[in-house]
Amino acid sequence: MAAESKRAVVAATAGNVAIAVIKFVAAAMTGSSAMMSEGIHSIVDTGNGALLLHGLRRGARPADAQHPFGHGMEVYFWSLIVAMSIFGIGGGMSMYEGINHLRHPAALQNPLVNYIVLALAVVFESLSFSVAWKTFRRSRRGRPTLAAIHHGKDPSLFTILFEDTAALLGLFVAFVGVLVSHLFHAPLADGAASVVIGLILVVAALWLAHESRSLLVGEAADPELVAALEEVALADPAVVGLGAVLTMQLGPDEVLLNIEVQFTPGSPVEAIHKAVHRIEQHIAERFPEVSRVFIEVEVPPAAPGL
């Protein structure tokens, strides 16, 4: 899954570089505030793609003495930085540009250039969104989109999905702003569109920050995975029950499991050791993402006289 996420990030970043260039050229030629905001948006998305790739690379490093559980949470940290970047740079600068245009409106020049650039941008963003959506769809496990995002453990993937969705919405708003400004000679519409684009970025950033924060502070594994792990433990003939089943997501594809397993009263030590080994082996075979397994043994003493 990590390789697919990286491919989606690379596709989005490459597209954003090309889009940013043509948007800024169009903004310079036409004086469009909305197009300038879209250029800022694409530059921010390009930088964010680089940050996500940096996070994926650092998160893939093996465990060491200082980080015995690995570096998988690096991805969560850099996703939070991306959210702050979208909020502060993307949303803030777009709104500033729009408000400045509202205070000092100016008529559009060469609006046809804007239409051509917006059409090209839609093509590039749609291709990027298609790659991200296909990757996301394979990981959603039949859940509704919003639920799949909430339960998702790979922020690099849903970050790109957020960015591409916000980009397509922003392009639509920019088109409406340019069209109204052009047809009705209303330059204020162009500035208003820039403010709306900024608000879209702020909302996307806040949502992304919320999801990244939850993962960064230590989120449990997917409920379906937890239930499946419980089934594996209970399926062993020596196990009579379970105590606490604690999980934590250590990275997009890494899970820590701490499980209390209850055995038959008076079970011999050798039988318990074999059962623990079987459970660990079955978990490793079925769920390779569960990289850290800690089994706590609970054996009530045998009843007196037995």
Predicted regions: what they are:
Residues 1-223:
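Alpha-helical transmembrane cores and adjacent cytosolic helix/loop segments
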